[in-house]
Amino acid sequence: MTITHTLSKLRTLFNDVKKVYYLNKELKAADLGTEMTAFMDLPVLEDGITLNTGEPDVTRIKIINGDNWCTRAKKGDPDISFQVASIAGEVNDLFMEKKVAVTGAASIIIEGATYSGNSYSLAPKSVKGSLILMSEDQSSVIVFPNVEMYASLVAADGDNPAYFNVTATPMANEEGADVMILGK
């Protein structure tokens, strides 16, 4: 027996997420070969990320004698979620619809300190773009070239600072790709 793909050739791993970058546009394969400016380096909580692209829904078709005749499969539902631990204005603006600035005479003074910012709607906001995930050892990258995200603000959970619970749904880009997997 001749083995053409040995274990050493197959040892390209994605061994945990080190960085999550958000770009505010859909990516194509040709975009990856150019210098890109990431819109945002998201501060994702450790152990706060789930990357499951969905188990396929397989239906087995049987004939009258009980034998499997054929199968049909559909794409499964993805479970891609992460927690972004920041209430910086740029992050708030990304995940919530901005309403009115709270500055100047409208700002609040508590114990001599002045606070200002913005008001937001908590209604779900669709955020479209792409996600680039760098592995811990930077040997591989997973790119979701076209995602739609929704987030909810969690102001306190007892263990973590305030964060956004983000759910991302990968969609095919113009080229038909839902995911791009890259290695060094």
Language-model region placement:
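Charged, amphipathic alpha-helical segments
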Residues: 2-7, 87-120
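Solvent-exposed edge beta-strands and adjacent loop segments
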Residues: 2-94, 147-163
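Short, surface-exposed beta-strand/loop "edge" segments at domain boundaries and coil↔beta transitions
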Residues: 29-32, 89-92, 130, 136-144, ...
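N-terminal start-of-chain detector that recognizes signal peptides
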Residues: 50-57, 101-107, 113-117, 136-143
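Acidic surface patches and DE-rich sequence motifs
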Residues: 63, 135, 173
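Beta-strand secondary-structure signal
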Residues: 79-83, 130-132, 165-169
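Phosphate/anion-contacting hairpin/loop surfaces
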Residues: 116-138
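Mixed-charge, glycine-accented linear interaction segment located at domain edges/termini
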Residues: 138-184
